[in-house]
C-alpha cells in the first residue's frame, strides 16, 4: 500500500469512495448531498482547494486525503468502507503529519464517534464544538501539534 498524489484520472473513483464511506458512517440526513452532488463538489474542491492524495494497492484506490496546506488542515480523510480497521487510515494520517509537520487542524461531526476515536488515538485534541448550520448538528474542532 502506498500513498501518492491523486490525479484527475482518479477523481471519479475517489468521489464515489468519499460518498460510500460517508454513507457507511450512518449519520447522513436529508441535507446531505447526492452521489452526483458529491462528485461535483469533489471535482471543484480537487481543482481549487485541495492537495489530494490516495492510498493505492496495485490498481485499487482504498482511501483519500484532502489537505489544505495554507490552513494546515485536513479537509477530508476517508477510507473505503471495506478497508476500515486495516491500517489505511493510519497510513493516510501519518502521511498528513509528514506533509504538515508543524501541526494540523480538522473538523468532524460530534456523532461521528469512530472518526473522533481515530483522531484522539492519533494525538489530536478536541479544541471546541459548535453547531454546523449546513448539517444541523454539532461539529468538533480538533488539533494535532508535534510531540503530542
Residue ranges and their predicted role:
Residues 1-3:
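Extreme N-terminal starter segment of soluble prokaryotic enzymes
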Residues 5-82, 93-95, 99, 132:
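Acetyl-CoA-dependent GNAT
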Residues 50, 137-141:
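Short hydrophobic/aromatic beta-strand or adjacent loop that forms the aromatic wall/cage
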Residues 80-82, 86, 110-111:
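Active-site acidic-Proline motif in GNAT/NAT acetyltransferases
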Residues 90-91, 111-128, 134-137:
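Conserved active-site alpha-helix within GNAT-family acetyltransferase domains
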Residues 99-111:
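Conserved GNAT acetyl-CoA-binding A-motif
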Residues 140-148:
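Terminal substrate-recognition subdomain of acyl/acetyltransferases
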Amino acid at each position: 500500500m502506498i500513498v501518492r498524489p491523486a490525479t484527475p484520472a482518479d477523481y471519479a473513483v475517489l468521489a464515489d469512495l468519499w460518498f460510500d464511506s460517508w454513507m457507511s458512517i450512518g449519520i447522513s440526513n436529508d441535507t446531505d448531498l447526492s452521489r452526483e452532488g458529491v462528485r461535483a463538489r469533489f471535482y471543484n474542491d480537487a481543482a481549487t482547494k485541495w492537495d489530494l492524495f490516495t492510498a493505492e494497492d496495485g490498481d485499487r484506490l482504498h482511501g483519500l486525503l484532502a489537505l489544505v496546506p495554507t490552513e494546515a488542515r485536513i479537509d477530508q480523510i476517508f477510507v473505503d468502507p471495506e478497508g476500515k480497521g486495516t491500517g489505511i487510515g493510519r497510513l493516510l494520517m501519518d502521511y498528513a503529519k509528514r506533509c504538515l509537520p508543524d501541526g494540523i487542524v480538522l473538523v468532524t461531526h460530534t456523532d461521528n464517534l469512530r472518526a473522533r476515536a481515530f483522531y484522539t488515538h492519533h494525538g489530536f485534541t478536541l479544541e471546541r464544538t459548535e453547531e454546523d448550520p449546513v448539517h444541523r448538528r454539532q461539529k468538533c474542532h480538533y488539533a494535532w501539534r508535534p510531540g503530542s
